[in-house]
């Protein structure tokens, strides 16, 4: 994820519908292609079973079928992610990746925010608002109150410092300082 990452309003029902379709489609594609490709590998390169004999040792061919199926799924994802129908699912996926990058540096960002470091405050503002967005989309009602509490605490800190902070100012490059 590079460049500017803005928080976007997402149609929850559309996102969930397309996300479910993508997940089910990928699992089904992976399962079906794994079996088909594994069987094709065994047919062309495998050891033929003898009546009453032990296993043929074609595990490596089945495994190769799974790897090939996984490669097909990755190819599909890479080509479909830019399609308008998949925009929201891909956006949320990128947002979750970015949240993970921020989370790995969260302690040092929070320390800098206590010293009113403006970039740290912008990062935290983006982080908590993006968490609230994703939790809402994923129906994660258990932890959204914690995120809202963190947002409230952050806003009080920003107000006390007399600083103006907007989550839209966030860029992933800001993380390099932490």
Model regions: which residues?
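Short, charged, amphipathic alpha-helical segments
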Residues: 118-125, 144-152
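Membrane-interfacial hairpin junctions
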Residues: 41-59
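Acidic, Ser/Thr-rich low-complexity segments on the non-lumenal side of membrane proteins
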Residues: 103-137
């Amino acid at each position: 994820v590079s460049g500017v990452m803005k928080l976007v309003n997402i149609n929850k029902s559309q996102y969930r519908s397309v996300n479910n379709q993508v997940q089910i489609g990928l699992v089904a594609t992976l399962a079906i292609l794994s079996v088909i490709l594994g069987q094709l590998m065994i047919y062309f390169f495998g050891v033929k079973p003898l009546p009453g004999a032990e296993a043929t040792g074609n595990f490596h061919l089945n495994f190769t079928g799974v790897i090939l199926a996984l490669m097909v799924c990755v190819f599909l994802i890479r080509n479909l992610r830019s399609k308008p129908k998949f925009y929201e699912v891909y956006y949320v996926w990128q947002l979750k990746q970015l949240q993970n990058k921020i989370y790995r540096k969260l302690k040092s960002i929070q320390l800098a925010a206590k010293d009113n470091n403006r970039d740290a405050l912008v990062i935290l503002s983006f982080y908590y608002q993006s968490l609230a967005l994703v939790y809402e989309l994923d129906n994660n009602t258990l932890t959204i109150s914690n995120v809202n509490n963190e947002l409230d605490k952050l806003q009080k800190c920003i107000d006390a410092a007399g600083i103006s902070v907007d989550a839209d100012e966030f860029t992933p490059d800001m993380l390099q300082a932490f």
